[in-house]
Amino acid sequence: GKRMIESKTDKDVTVFVASEFATDAPKLKESTFVVFISQSGETADSREALRITNSLGIPSLTITNVKGSTLSRETDHTALLYAGPEIAVASTKAYTAQLTVLMFLSYALKTELEKSELENLRKQIARTASEMEILVVNKEKVKEIAHQYLVGKRNAFFIGRGSDFDVSLESALKLKEISYIQAEGFAGGELKHGTIALIEDGTPIIALNTVYKTSELLRSNIEEVKARGANIFVISRSGTEKENDQIVLPLLAEEMYPL
């Protein structure tokens, strides 16, 4: 959300983990607007952070998947995800729905917004959804790759730059939740600052490479971990791909790739 909003507007965005906000609240100005993101709308830390925000008279928006939840009732504004109930352990539908709502929010906050921009955004999201469906249909290929790179491994690392780094953090969380493999996400440029010492022969590295302006830099990071014997699995896209990349996504608007 921070990356999206700051790229579209002149607004400064600060991100807080709800549990940290609740115990060490930042100094909030009257001009501050607080956005709460919660799948259930019932997370205790988020509820406490909202209580603090309300006590200071600061306006707020809750992005949630559950109509009538505590956060949706006690906030000033609510954006419902309409993603349906999460059945799996990991939140997947709600997460991608949250990203989509944040995209619309970033456009809505622009000083000047053309109607054609919103229409184009809707079209891009619809096209991306169709491409995501194709990936789901081809899940057997993904299963084979997972078996080749991850089965029997103690740990795994995700690397990326820009928005790919953001996705690497969420991807690592998903892998931990579902497989109990120790997984972490790192910014590609930070590998040399200690993290690379954890990489040994056969360590799985999932490299996300969809950001065009940092593509070659991430390729350098891939070579660094390859030199240490890492087993590398690359997800790239048309325009950043190389011949041996395991998954190459189709050409889309770059802001769609986190989905």
Annotate each language-model stretch with its function.
Residues G1-R127, R161, L208-E243, V248-E254:
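Glycine-rich phosphate-binding loops that contact phosphosugars or nucleotide phosphates
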Residues H77-P204, T214:
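Active-site phosphate/pyrophosphate-binding segments
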